[in-house]
Amino acid sequence: MKPLTAGVTRANEGLDQISWNILGQTYVPKSLSEDSFSWHATFPPGTFVPPHIHTTQDEFIYMLEGRLDLVLDGQESFATAGDLIRLPRNVPHGLFNKSETTVKCLFWVSPTARLYDLFWGIHSMAEQNPADVVALSAKHEVDFLPPPPEGA
């Protein structure tokens, strides 16, 4: 992986013009080094990232627009524009846009670990079916949690 270089990634651009479709959201990578990885995310209404754990990374989300409903270590919460979501490694978390407006936010993780490669893998799937996404994610140090039991 290349070392971090000085510079500016413009507002409507990603690294190397990359834009990924990840579970119905748009992720645009902004910076990448061994120590950290950041991306701009757009969550259309009704999209979500199911509860999961990053085993090798701390994750942060700075909210730019809209509201995300969260499940953080089993507790429900939410974040709106200007809020920072802190997600230490090994803490289960899920992100949900339950609103009727688009959510925009900036994510970053430290260290990068295998997340950049995971996003390429998910984006490249012909169909992002849950079983394949879960299996690929496990190979990249992100573990999705099973759904809660019926009636829970």
Where are these regions (language model features)?
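Glycine- and acidic-residue-biased ligand/ion/polar-headgroup-sensing regions
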Residues: 56-58, 62-68, 73
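Short beta-strand segments in beta-sandwich/barrel cores
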Residues: 47-49, 66-71, 85
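A short, N-terminal "cap"/entry segment at the start of jelly-roll beta-barrel domains
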Residues: 1-37, 125-152
